[in-house]
């Protein structure tokens, strides 16, 4: 057993870039029967971030599960990022996480202390979220993987969906894009330690703070931007809402260096899976470069919240969230349904 093996050397795809592509996933899930239960408010038949089940007239439980291979070599940081990513689904649905269970796959070639560090990173993020870890499950596996099964609670009227955007709303993104590209560059040892720290800081930041900034505001629709990229998750929102979302390319926050690496072809495999599914679902202006398109489809790991809300409410949200992040901004608007669900200008 070794402490010197790089975690990312044991993976082909890392973070949310390891997700099965949206096209394949949709074809599988659409063929499965749907469960009928009057208390199941949100199930897998929609593209929402978690399921929602009614406990009583005052309480719903939000359930989600998320795990993936490492995108960084430091085990503690990997644990933090994986936990932040799993917790995010509850925030995106308007709830607060309460209890979590560890899911860990661990290879015999690694020293057991590395597992302990991964779990410690997850524990600290769950504690920051105000939730508890109550157990978990382990599997021996040549490829390390970690994540959480999370349960959260909310009042029925607090639940947010990704399918209720209104014409005239503006779209806000709370974290910068380019995470998948930068992780791919890091695996190829093309970026320095300071840039790695910047990217991991973005990934490990809880969406708890963005969610808290929505309290009392009229949020029409919400999701988080993860493995299907900005265009993929915007498409889910536009399609579910029966609207078109126009994205302002010049307003999108992008990690410094991501466009350069995309131009060099340093992009994760998951981007091609996303493009294969999304290629006929968006239109781009003549001024949109190929590398920018790549960034917009880049699989994000523990990305930001994507919010649809009235412009006046958006200004209040941005004034609140500037205390937590410099990245949040208006990146688009919701239009009546047009020829394409997504338009990039």
Curated annotation (Swiss-Prot):
Record-annotated disulphide pairs = none
Active-site feature positions: 16
Highest taxon listed in the record's lineage? Bacteria
Give the CDD domains listed for this entry: SelD
EC assignment: the record states 2.7.9.3
Which residues does ATP bind? Answer: 19, 46-48, 66, 89, 136-138
Q: Site feature Important for catalytic activity: at which residues?
A: 19
- Kindly list the cofactors needed: Mg(2+)
Q: Which reaction does it catalyse?
A: hydrogenselenide + ATP + H2O = selenophosphate + AMP + phosphate + 2 H(+)
Q: Which GO terms describe its biological process?
A: selenocysteine biosynthetic process
Any single GO molecular-function term of the entry would be:
ATP binding
- GO cellular-component terms in the record? cytoplasm
Which amino acid positions bind Mg(2+), per UniProt?
Answer: 49, 89, 224
Pfam families from the UniProt entry: AIRS, AIRS_C
Keywords attached to this Swiss-Prot or TrEMBL record, sorted alphabetically, are:
ATP-binding, Kinase, Magnesium, Metal-binding, Nucleotide-binding, Selenium, Transferase
- The top EC class, named as a word, is transferase
Cofactor binding comment, as recorded: Binds 1 Mg(2+) ion per monomer.
Q: Where are the transmembrane segments?
A: none
What is the protein's quaternary organization? Answer: Homodimer.
What does the protein in this record do?
Synthesizes selenophosphate from selenide and ATP.
Question: Which family, according to the similarity comment?
Answer: Belongs to the selenophosphate synthase 1 family. Class I subfamily.
Protein name as it appears in the record: Selenide, water dikinase
Q: Which organism is the protein's source?
A: Clostridium botulinum (strain Eklund 17B / Type B)
